[in-house]
Each structure stands twice: as C-alpha cells, then as structure tokens.
C-alpha cells in the first residue's frame, strides 16, 4: 500500500522536529524512509535503545505528516537504527570540509611507505562530500593506488 501518494516524488522532508531530516529512495519507490540527525540532537540518543529511537521517530513523523502514530505503526514493516555516535570506532562519523581541509585531504590521500592507504568520505574532494558515494569513490581511489603500486 502506498502510504502517501502525494509524497512519492519527494526526496527530502526537512522538519523542525527532534529528528529534522528524512529522505526517501526517490526515484525508486521502495517504501524506505530514512531519518537522520546529527550534532547536539544526536548526542541525546547516544545511549538510547533502538526502540527508544523508533518511538521518537514515530512522534516526529506524526507531527510532520499529520498522521496518527498508530497508523504509522500499522504500516511499519521493519526498522533499523544506526547509532554512529555510540559506535566506538566512528564516534559520530559525519565529515564536512573546513578551512584547511583541502591540504589535510591531500596529506591523508598520500600512502605511507606505499603500504598504508586511507579512504573514506572525508578524503573525497568531489561534490558528494559526506556521503556513502564519497566513501566509495575514495575507496576506489585507494584501490587504484594499491593496484598501481603492486603491478
């Protein structure tokens, strides 16, 4: 069932709720809706259980879409919470460029003794910064450097 046909062409929903950003898989009509939050709001959920995050997400969607929470629950098939703030390996993990980022990126993109290579969204210099696409492009660059050094 298409829950909100009038929103099918929506890519992003930006709200003034605790979880302020939502995006779809547009143009794919998969029914997947991703909520995203960062900064001080994310720190509020550092120790939250996935169920607690879901409760807040449903409240935010209820407020933004003007759909009763019970109806949202009825139509929810599954959910997953990625709590990067609580992950000891990422401790937050969203990157954005600041003054000096270009020089730092150049240094970090240089292999150490042709044996240690770095990759990730922060090392990508294109237009998709801070995304999975950026991390993937950076990884491809590192793989190409490795292949170049081993052939």
Locate each region found by the language model.
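Conserved flavin/dinucleotide-binding core of flavoenzymes
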Residues: 2-151
